[in-house]
């Protein structure tokens, strides 16, 4: 098969500030505000360990991904690297799985945003709000990558300001200088059954919840491929991922568990951040958090549209999807991939309404372990890509720490987590559903090979695609 440049038809419209803020937005998902209360209720104050372990995993994965992305920037990111390092079947499979993950995210995030807007304007039905939001963001993504970057820049900036304000407010309360509520100190970290009230098993369970909060950090490597200097942006984003996770996750969650009891009634339904605001007697706490969550899910929806379309475009350019999906418009935007990704997302909504409940549940569950499979593929790809680069005399400007020992440790850890999920009733169906979906995609490889006369089981030659 001929060698194709995966980004030759895409623009370089993303500026430095866009990529910088995208790298921050990638680790601040709506799950930080919505899902953290579930993890806290599971592990208590020891949820900090769960976020720490999950954060360390993401730091390792981002470092591995950055090593490959700096050497060969590509909008297909880890899917392309899996092509080259493991084999065509691996890049093909993980690429379609990743596209499917973000396709499912689109209607789910749109529905959350629509529910919030409906609570503000009850006269407008939820489905109409959902449709309008998705169409508006689809239109924005169709115009140019610069539009996506600009819109995401301001959404991310709002999220950053909100979290920093929350941390400052919480720090003032913890140190006893907050005049409107009688809260101070960090005694709540051990007052209700100790720091680890439910044991280490609960910490592991919470880690399975928190791990998926970080999904999206890898988007920056795809986005950087559409900038003028992708290697510099990737290095900067990777080097800053440690402090981003430390500030936005560890600091803000520390504020939460230090101020409110982990076993507070109604924590799951109210939410952890809103509970803190109400404890501090902040007026309109619900309205404030609804606004922040709305910004977060809109940002996530915007990124989901972008990421799904770029992965579909990359698959098309490599011959792993119909050629029409690789078409771009005058703005060098893959408009067919954007429209098809949006259409596929709404097809899942139709399935939800007209198909049996078990069918839609399988669709949702099938995305449950994709994040871990993506991380596993990145680790295995980096393990082999380093040797390929060295054999070809390629320059490795950014290196994974303690190679290959840390890489092997990450592979072993992810495998361990997948095995644990397989034997836990709460996550068992997710692993099985994701596995069945992956197996189904792999089974299409011979069909695709005959249809397009591709050799999907061979490795691609390594080349820089910028």
Residue ranges, per PLM feature:
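Membrane-interface "cap" regions at the ends of multi-pass membrane proteins
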Residues: 1-35, 40-46, 58-63, 75, ...
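Helix-loop-helix connectors at the membrane interface of multi-pass transporters/channels
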Residues: 1-7, 80-83, 89, 110-130, ...
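Helix-loop-helix junctions that connect adjacent transmembrane segments
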Residues: 5-10, 47-48, 122-125, 157-290
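Extracellular loop-to-transmembrane helix junctions
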Residues: 11, 24, 34-129, 133, ...
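Membrane-helix boundary/coupling elements in multi-pass transport proteins
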Residues: 74, 97-111, 214-227, 283-323, ...
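TM-loop-TM module centered on a large, flexible mid-protein loop between adjacent transmembrane helices
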Residues: 80-81, 87, 119, 189, ...
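Membrane-interface loop-to-helix entry segments
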Residues: 127-184, 215, 238-242, 364-377, ...
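C-terminal membrane-solvent junction of multi-pass transporters and transport-like membrane proteins
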Residues: 154, 324-332, 372-429, 455-458, ...
């Amino acid at each position: 098969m001929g060698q194709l440049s995966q980004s030759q038809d895409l623009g370089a419209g993303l500026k430095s500030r866009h990529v910088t803020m995208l790298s921050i937005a990638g680790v601040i998902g709506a799950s930080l505000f919505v899902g953290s209360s579930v993890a806290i209720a599971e592990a208590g104050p020891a949820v900090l360990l769960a976020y720490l372990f999950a954060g360390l995993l993401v730091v390792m994965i981002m470092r591995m991904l950055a090593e490959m992305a700096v050497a060969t920037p590509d909008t297909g990111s880890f899917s392309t690297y899996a092509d080259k390092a493991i084999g065509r079947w691996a890049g093909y499979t993980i690429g379609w799985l990743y596209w499917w993950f973000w396709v499912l995210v689109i209607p789910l995030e749109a529905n959350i945003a629509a529910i919030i807007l409906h609570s503000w304007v009850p006269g407008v039905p939820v489905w109409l709000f959902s449709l309008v939001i998705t169409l508006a963001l689809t239109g924005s993504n169709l115009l140019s990558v610069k539009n996506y970057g600009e819109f995401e820049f301001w959404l991310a900036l709002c999220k950053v300001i909100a979290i920093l304000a929350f941390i400052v407010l919480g720090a003032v309360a913890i140190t006893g200088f907050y005049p409107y509520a009688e809260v101070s100190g960090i005694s709540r970290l051990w007052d209700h059954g100790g720091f680890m009230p439910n044991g280490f098993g609960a910490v592991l369970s919470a880690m399975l919840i928190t791990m998926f909060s970080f999904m999206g950090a890898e988007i920056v490597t795809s986005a950087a491929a559409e900038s003028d200097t992708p290697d510099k942006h990737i290095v900067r984003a990777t080097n800053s991922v440690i402090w981003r996770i430390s500030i936005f996750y560890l600091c803000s969650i520390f504020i939460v568990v230090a101020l409110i009891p982990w076993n507070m009634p109604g924590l799951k339904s109210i939410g952890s951040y809103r509970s803190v605001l109400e404890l501090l007697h902040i007026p309109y706490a619900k309205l404030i958090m609804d606004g922040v969550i709305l910004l977060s899910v809109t940002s996530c929806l915007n990124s989901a549209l972008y990421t799904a379309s770029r992965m579909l475009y990359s698959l098309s350019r490599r011959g792993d999807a119909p050629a029409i999906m690789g078409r771009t418009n005058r703005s060098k935007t893959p408009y067919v991939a954007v429209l098809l990704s949006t259409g596929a997302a709404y097809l899942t909504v139709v399935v939800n309404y007209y198909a049996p409940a078990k069918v839609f549940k399988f669709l949702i569950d099938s995305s449950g372990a994709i994040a871990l499979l993506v991380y596993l593929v990145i680790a295995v790809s980096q393990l082999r890509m380093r040797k390929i680069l060295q054999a070809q005399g390629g320059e490795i400007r950014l290196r994974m720490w303690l190679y290959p020992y840390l890489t092997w440790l990450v592979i072993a850890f992810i495998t361990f987590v997948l095995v644990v999920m397989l034997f836990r009733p709460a996550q068992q169906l997710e692993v099985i559903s994701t596995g069945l979906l992956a197996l189904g995609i792999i089974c299409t490889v011979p069909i695709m090979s005959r249809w397009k006369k591709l050799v999907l089981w061979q490795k691609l030659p390594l080349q820089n695609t910028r």
